[in-house]
C-alpha cells in the first residue's frame, strides 16, 4: 500500500471524512439513543475501524515526528473494535466520538494544510 501511495494527505483526508461522517451520524443524539440504535453503532464503529487502519498505514518514523497525534491509541482502539467485536464498550465509543474526534480532526487538518509534510517515498514502512 505505502509504495502505491503518493501522498500521506490522502490518508489524512480519509480520516477527516470518517470523523465528519461519524459526527454527522451521531449529531443531536444522546448516549441513550446511541445505545438503542444498532445501525448507527455499526456505522460509527466501522468508521473508527477505518480511522485506526488508515493510521496504521503511516510509517512509525512519521508517527514519531508528528507525535501530537496519538497514532498508537487509535490503532489500538481499532484493534479492540475488530477483535473484541462481541463485547464493544459503547460508552468508550461514545466518549471517543464526543471527546477525542474533534481534536483528531483538527490535527489531521493541520497535517493536510502543512506544505512541509514529507511524501511516502521518503519513508520505509
Give residue ranges: language-model regions.
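Solvent-exposed interaction patches of small proteins and small membrane subunits
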Residues: 1-125
